[in-house]
Curated annotation (Swiss-Prot):
Gene name linked to the record: rplW
Name of the molecule in the record: Large ribosomal subunit protein uL23
GO CC annotation terms, alphabetical: ribonucleoprotein complex; ribosome
One Pfam family it belongs to: Ribosomal_L23
Keywords for this protein: Ribonucleoprotein, Ribosomal protein, RNA-binding, rRNA-binding
Organism the protein comes from: Thermotoga neapolitana (strain ATCC 49049 / DSM 4359 / NBRC 107923 / NS-E)
GO biological process: translation
Cited function: One of the early assembly proteins it binds 23S rRNA. One of the proteins that surrounds the polypeptide exit tunnel on the outside of the ribosome. Forms the main docking site for trigger factor binding to the ribosome.
Summary of subunit composition and partner proteins: Part of the 50S ribosomal subunit. Contacts protein L29, and trigger factor when it is bound to the ribosome.
Lineage: Bacteria, Thermotogati, Thermotogota, Thermotogae, Thermotogales
Length: 100
């Protein structure tokens, strides 16, 4: 299967800012929503070049849709891809540290 080439800014959709994600930052782990077509190598390259840091490893989770109801209407949330990026010792993403 041929992998589609994504630009660096197309790979990362947005950072995930939750209590759990904020706790993970103490372990140098940052959580991002990423493009569903992106692979681990593309995510690593995008984080390293955009934030000027060194990435140790990338874990990827495919989030399944959840059923939702609004009155009598039934539907589902969209499926999406989440990446937990672990940075090498001594690196932090300063742009994301000021958000909490």
């Amino acid at each position: 299967m041929k992998q589609e080439k994504l630009s660096l800014h197309d790979v990362l959709v947005r950072p995930i800012i939750t209590e759990k994600a904020l706790r993970l930052r103490e372990q140098r782990k940052y959580v991002f929503e990423v493009n569903p077509l992106a692979n681990k190598n593309q995510i690593k390259e995008a984080v390293e070049k955009i934030f000027n840091v060194k990435v140790d490893k990338v874990n990827v989770i495919n989030m399944k849709p959840k059923p939702k109801r609004r009155g009598i209407f039934e539907g589902r949330t969209r499926s999406w891809k989440k990446a937990v990026v672990t940075l090498k010792e001594g690196y932090t993403i300063k742009e994301l540290e000021g958000e909490h």
